Structures are given as structure tokens and as C-alpha cells.
Amino acid sequence: MLHTKIIDASVEKIEISNAEDFLNSSKFGAIIYFVGTVRDNNENKEVTGITYDAKDSMVIKSFEEIYEDVESELNIKNKAVFIEHIKGYVGLSEKSIIIGVACMHRD
């Protein structure tokens, strides 16, 4: 089960609760999250925010290809993956990407 979405920052924000809602199931024994945020510097230069731009269909296709590669190599049953990435301006400490993975076993 895979959920992917590009979020328009001018319309909405990425919310971890969306990942929790998608991944919450009594079928899963483990859930892990990665949350990317904007930091205040890059290569020793001050940063006040980042503007992300991409062709949505290409990004979604890349996420799907990564999912399919992992699925074929690891053969993990009863899994769910949630990926949302922001598009547009993201300020300091704001979320830019959320990746969540849930599976049946913790090994």
C-alpha cells in the first residue's frame, strides 16, 4: 500500500497526522517516520527558507519506482508507505517532507 502526494505550500501544510492516519493499523507491529525540515544554514550561508519546485508527475513516478524497487528486493509483506513532499516556499523549521513506513514485523 503506497500513498504519495505533492503538497502546494500556498494551499496547505504537510501534517504528520495524515501519515499517522494512513499508517495506523492493527496489522502493523512497527511504524517509523522521517520528517525533513528547513534548517537555518546551508554550506555556511544563512537560510531563511527554501522554495521547492518540481513537476509533480515526475516526483510521484520517482517515489513509485523507489517503492517498487524496495518491494521487489526485500519482499516485505503487509506494509504501507506514506510519502508527502511540499512544493513552494517553506520557512525555517517547517516540514518539507514526511516519509512513513509501517510493516508487520520489527526485524
Per-range role (PLM):
Residues 1-95, 106:
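N-terminal, polar/charged subdomain of small-to-medium soluble alpha/beta proteins
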